[in-house]
Amino acid sequence: MRSIALALAAAPAVLAQSQLWGQCGGIGWNGPTTCVSGATCTKINDWYHQCLPGGNNNNPPPATTSQWTPPPAQTSSNPPPNNGGGGGNTLHEKFKARGKQYFGTEIDHYHLNNNQLMEIARREFGQITHENSMKWDATEPSRGSFSFGNADRVVDWATSNGKLIRGHTLLWHSQLPQWVQNINDRNTLTQVIENHVKTIMTRYKGKIFHYDVVNEILDENGGLRNSVFSRVLGEDFVGIAFRAARATDPDAKLYINDYNLDSANYAKTRGMINLVNKWVSQGVPIDGIGTQAHLAGPGGWNPASGVPAALQALAGANVKEVAITELDIQGAGANDYVTVANACLNVQKCVGITVWGVSDRDSWRSNENPLLYDGSYRPKAAYNALMNAL
């Protein structure tokens, strides 16, 4: 996840400061904790604080990892059918009927006791992505010591309910334990990456069909983001991770996933296409590109109107498939959601859409009301528009 951003040049500062849209805090962060003029350091989640323009009026709240509190348990005498089942009358079933693999959502272990949310997830969606419990800090907090309890709970729920699962994520610069960030030896980091990838994918082999092998590795100019992976290994970490993934589970589809890929001519979008083509030509087994699609409303810099051309451009890369992986839209405009759904329907390589949460109450952007269900778990106009359009 990431706040929607267009990277802009910032004025130089005498003291070290993070640039607009840069990181400015979070667990394990050792860089600048103040922002350049015109930006405010805003907590996105416990691990990531970001320099956002101006004040906090339109900034996302802390992620639900640390803030979410389950509502009182509610019982249902008539639980909805499993497998996204509703007699062909659910988002997932309608999307599949149009030739796609899935229409999915994001949940995590801290949602499992929320009966209202989970009933919607069970009824409407055919694919699940973990929000946080498969990230490195959750799965390997210390070297060689793995913890799978929370990730397992989500996998068990998904498999028992017939849901596809996207593994999110194997390598990410954020929510990364300090022991990994402290590595400065090439051979050590290579071994750590390979072991992390192989251990997770071995555990879930045959259960997870897509993996975001690397997540948010590009900067806004379309080059590699500065991270421990790029500092120690350069571009080689991409091949190391993908080759380890392919060797461990040859049947899983392997993705590179990023945000701000919502305009066909934006430098980051072009950089993604160029780098993926280069890496694939070098034998790196990248199967797909995931575009997160954390979108602004009309008038914002990355509205839904840019998605059709951007998705078509990404599909032009030398990959087998593309997917919209973390969709949410400021204000949840009905026309905006239909525009994004049609973009995927009109691109042959687009295999599916994942919305980043079930309801506005549980969204990392809850003050922007970006999802298909409101804070009381009632379907919104965007949901109804999608059902009618599909």
Swiss-Prot record:
Q: Where is the composition biased (Pro residues)?
A: 59-82
Q: How is its activity regulated?
A: Partial inhibition of activity is detected in the presence of Ag(+), Cu2(+) and SDS. Like most fungal xylanases, activity is completely inhibited by Hg(2+) since Hg(2+) could interact with tryptophan residues and oxidize the indole ring. Beta-mercaptoethanol enhances the enzymatic activity by counteracting the oxidation effects of the S-S linkage between cysteine residues.
Residue stretches making up the CBM1 domain:
17-52
The record's annotation in PROSITE patterns points to: CBM1_1, CBM1_2, GH10_2
For this record, the Gene Ontology CC terms, alphabetical, are:
extracellular region
Q: Where is the GH10 domain?
A: 85-389
Biotech use: Considering the detergent and textile solutions that are neutral to alkaline and must be tolerant to high temperatures and SDS, the three xylanases XynA, XynB and XynC having such favorable properties might represent potential candidates in the detergent and textile industries. Together with their wide substrate specificities, the XynA, XynB and XynC thermophilic xylanases could also be of considerable commercial interest in various other industries, especially in the brewing industry.
Q: Superkingdom of this entry's organism?
A: Eukaryota
Could you tell me which Gene3D superfamilies the record lists for this protein? Glycosidases
**Residue segments, region Disordered:** 55-92
Signal peptide segment:
1-16
Q: Residues in the active site?
A: E216 (proton donor), E326 (nucleophile)
InterPro entries the UniProt entry points to: CBD_sf, Cellulose-bd_dom_fun, GH10, GH10_dom, Glycoside_hydrolase_SF
| Principal place of residence | secreted
PANTHER family per the UniProt record, alphabetical: ENDO-1,4-BETA-XYLANASE C, GLYCOSYL HYDROLASE
Supply the name of the protein: Endo-1,4-beta-xylanase C
Gene behind this protein = XynC
